[in-house]
Regions:
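Gly/Pro/Ser/Thr-rich low-complexity, intrinsically disordered segments predominantly at protein N-termini
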Residues: 1-115
Length: 115
């Protein structure tokens, strides 16, 4: 049985520790943990094309582009999400390897199940 099934809620540090050991990705919202579903080929292609276009546009700037394997902390909502694509230009995010917390832009690709 997983820790998520045994434990009703997590605090953020416990979630980050637990999530780092999981084979699948989970998002976190105010103590609750949610397993992430896979994406279609079209969804992944659209997200990748957007990430590549942003990366090319931002080349030479202090900004970095991340895809769906990097967590984004939304402190105001006590949450960690895996956006399809996001951009951060914050120097503080360069030092943080497990997640980023200062997104300048967030891109979510909508699908029939998420729109």
């Amino acid at each position: 049985m997983s820790l998520a099934a045994e434990q009703a809620t997590f605090d953020a540090p416990a979630y980050l520790t637990w999530e780092a050991e999981q084979p699948a990705k989970h998002e976190y919202l105010d103590g609750e943990v949610f397993a992430m579903a896979g994406a279609s080929a079209a969804h992944v292609t659209i997200a990748l094309n957007m990430a590549m276009a942003l990366r090319n546009h931002l080349r030479g700037s202090p900004c970095s582009v991340f895809i769906s394997d990097m967590k984004l902390q939304v402190a105001a909502d006590n949450a960690f999400f895996y956006p399809d694509v996001f951009v951060t230009c914050a120097p503080s995010d360069k030092a943080q390897d497990q997640y980023k917390s200062s997104a300048t832009l967030v891109v979510e690709v909508l699908s029939p199940t998420t729109s």
